[in-house]
Swiss-Prot record:
Coiled coil: none annotated. PANTHER family: DNA REPAIR PROTEIN RADC (PTHR30471), UPF0758 PROTEIN YEES-RELATED (PTHR30471:SF3). Belongs to the UPF0758 family. A motif (JAMM motif) lies at residues 173-186. Residues 102-224 form the MPN domain. It comes from Nitrosococcus oceani (strain ATCC 19707 / BCRC 17464 / JCM 30415 / NCIMB 11848 / C-107). GO terms for biological process: proteolysis. It comes from the Bacteria. This is UPF0758 protein Noc_0236. Keywords: Hydrolase, Metal-binding, Metalloprotease, Protease, Zinc. Gene3D superfamilies: Cytidine Deaminase, domain 2. GO terms for molecular function: metal ion binding; metallopeptidase activity.
Length: 224
């Protein structure tokens, strides 16, 4: 049966308009993105099959081009459309950060860092540069490494902070292992960066570790 033959309150698009996106299942949200199904299958049927094939909505959203296009009903056009949607979401979070004090909205800050860093299969060290009112000036990915770690150079972090005329920074990196607990090396580099930046009166407000579904704040843990 075609979706247009379903009761109005069960159709994904109408359901979203009436009850909001939170009321929809992963399959229903994906069906709206797909718009159409394939021969003999509605968009919802196809969405359910794709979620089962990839294992989760997150796995589908983070699939590379080859994996994505190999799935039935998907292709380059859908891949580019999806990447555009994901990037708009990241930019919306970034714009939200830039309009306020990151210390008064730490959840948005952490959601943004998760969106930027979680999917990497290797370690990425990044930095949020802030003005004297703790508003975001810029976000930069500074160092990339392997699954086990990334080499961080305080001189380069200092150079970029001065280039942005930053008054404070929030450090961040991901743990591809998914575990957000800090290593001894994480604690050491945080202290080195804190000391180096203090020489030019730039404060390290926090160091966020992004894991799989969790984050850790050095400030909240008392490690700064």
């Amino acid at each position: 049966m075609a979706i247009t033959d379903w009761p109005v309150h069960e159709r994904p698009r109408e359901k979203l308009l009436q009850r909001g996106p939170n009321a929809l299942s992963d399959a229903e949200l994906l069906a709206i993105f797909l718009r159409t199904g394939v021969a003999g299958k509605t968009a919802v049927d196809l969405a359910r099959e794709l979620l089962e094939s990839f294992g989760s909505l997150r796995a589908l959203l983070e699939a590379d081009l080859k994996q994505f296009c190999h799935a039935p009903g998907l292709g380059i056009a859908k891949y580019t459309q999806l990447q555009a949607c994901l990037e708009m979401g990241r930019r919306h979070l970034e714009d939200t950060l830039k309009r306020g004090d990151v210390l008064t909205d730490p959840q948005t800050t952490q959601r943004y860092l998760v969106a930027r860093l979680r999917a990497y299969p290797f370690e990425v060290f990044s930095c949020l540069f802030l003005d004297n009112r703790h508003r975001v000036l810029a976000f930069e990915e500074l160092f990339r490494g392997t699954i086990d770690g990334a080499s961080v150079h305080p001189r380069e972090v200092l150079k970029r902070a001065l280039a942005h005329n930053a008054a404070a920074v929030i450090l961040a990196h991901n743990h591809p292992s998914g575990v957000a607990e800090p290593s001894r090396a994480d604690e050491c580099i945080t202290q080195r960066l804190k000391e180096a930046l203090a020489l030019v009166d730039i404060r390290v407000l926090d160091h966020i570790i992004v894991g799989d579904g969790e984050t850790l704040s050095f400030a909240e843990r008392g490690l700064l």
